Swiss-Prot record:
GO CC terms, sorted: cell cortex; chromatin; chromosome passenger complex; chromosome, centromeric region; kinetochore; meiotic spindle midzone; nucleus; spindle midzone
Description of how the protein assembles with itself and partners: Component of the CPC complex.
UniProt cross-references to InterPro entries, sorted A to Z: Borealin_C (IPR046466), Cell_div_borealin (IPR018867)
Main location: nucleus
Protein's gene: borr
Designated name of the protein: Borealin
Lineage, opening ranks: Eukaryota, Metazoa, Ecdysozoa, Arthropoda, Hexapoda
Species whose genome carries this gene: Drosophila melanogaster
BP terms from Gene Ontology: cell division; mitotic sister chromatid segregation; protein localization to spindle microtubule
Amino acid sequence: MPRTKIPKNSKRNREVANREEKVRLYELKMDSRLISIDSLETKFLSAVDHQVKTLLGQVQKELANLKMPEVLRLFEELDRFSDFKASDQTQLLASMSMSGSAIEGHAPSATGSRNDEEDSSIGASGGSILAAHTGSLLRSTKAMRTPGPLHSARARRARRSRSACGDLNILHSAKPPSISSSSSSSRNSRSKLRTPMASRAKAFSADRTPLKQKQMRSGSPTTPPMAFLRYPKPGEVALSKYGSPMVAQVMPDKFANVNIPIRNGVLSLRPKKLDADEVESNLLENLDEDTLNQIKTLHENLQMIVNKASQAVFK
């Protein structure tokens, strides 16, 4: 009777595998949940940041730079912020920046708010909006995340950092796209910057040949057909179609021969006249039908060569 008792080692291994699978599924679920929480956090932070940027864009530059005591004194003098007048120097700088942008062909910024009362401060608000918007972006990049349970859980795993690069790209996107030169497309690799080796002729190979040269040489090369293969001479290097060196069989002697593969070896025919009793019948029994058909085709080719050579000699 075969023993049906399960070994303890296999049972223990199966339990360990089950525990690892459960832990892996739990980690996958936690990762998906953390990703969803991060997406919600990013969504709400971007909404709040957008509202703050909108408010900062509506406030004039001098008004935004005021300190708290000055703001309190300003509340006593003004009924609303739209009545605040910028100084003459600020208006001059704003008008110069607006005229410079108009000469360069850039449209002036239209992010500033339209006050209920149109006064002389509208021209100065256009130049101050971009500066306030840029300052708010830079201040938002320096904000630190509030530590909490989510932050400690994320610290256990290597995740993508939420750096300031994503927000700073908005600043760079306002610049006009620069026209890249033709030299950037062909970049020098590290090997080209090193000391060059001695120049040598590189053979064409299947792994080094460019695609265009492969297509040019994809056709049949100018080599004779398979019935007229030539063995390399002693000391001659045999190359493949694409120039790779090959290990080829070298003829030891300079004479014609015919090699016939049989089941237990190769039957080599030398240019020597054979008698009928020299041909062993047990060797011919090892020939299969395909090899016999190949020998017949080879016999016809040899007979054709003999006839052509005889006609060429007698002419």
